[in-house]
Amino acid sequence: MYLLSDNIPCSFDGSFHYSWDYAQQVHIPHYSQEVGPVYFKTPRKCNVFGMCCEGSGKQVFYLVDESDSIGKGADSVVSMVHHYLYWYGHGEIDGKFHFDNAAGQNKNNIVLWYGLWRVLLGYHRSIEYSTMIAGHTKFEPDWHFGIWKNRWRRVNAETLHDIADTVDQSSKKGHNIAQLVNDGSKPVTFYQWRTFLSQYFKPLKNITKYHHFFISAEAPGIVNVKILSDSPVVSVSLLKMSPPREIIKYRYNDFVIELMNKVDCCILIPVVLRCFIFCAIYIIILVTLPEKVNCSMKEDMFNQLS
């Protein structure tokens, strides 16, 4: 699955910190000198989702046209996070993520299940989620949004591609990167993550009261939660059943391929050839038996073989 990415999962023995958030939606057409939404009573809406890698100082802006949007729910968020880690991730072993405290978008079971799923498949060795405390002001994605909005207020935009141009031109060093949903080279697909992941994981009760979630490959299907950073750890198993065969196959891909190759070789060897090999082994055993062994024993062994 990840062979198309520049950075294969778990190829970098280290950790990276990511943050994500939604910005206020923008409308097109947009003109820098307009007094307000006077003429266009129903302008076209564009949702803006930012995924920031703080180690690189870059943020990808997902521009979602209203015709492509499925809302701002968990399925939309997880789909864009999944796309980002596929195309822009650094292949780190340990991933750390910060996001807003909003339950409908971020702090919910779908986002938590997605982290469990990634660890089970071996895309991360560990994942740590941390949510902002209610009433917080700004964090890393807002800095990138502010730089872009400074550019946005001074330009005209009539199409979605015009919005993408304002994102790319807002930072001289390329810190802001535009990503269209219908990009021909890196298209964004929105999946029904809730339907898929609910087959394998159970909901975490009272999820909204926790602010820290830790998932490790050493304990598959188990999440360690804390209310605050210095609160005691509570371990909860969310796995409904044993991991599906597809998960085991992906995670232990090399072992499975090696094992299947051995099985295929045994199947492809003709039955006559295999019988000949077994007979040769028995004959070697008979010939190399010590002289003190009774000849009748050799005859009995040969008769059993024949």
Language model feature labels by segment:
Residues M1-S306:
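Extended mixed-charge, aromatic/glycine-enriched low-complexity segments
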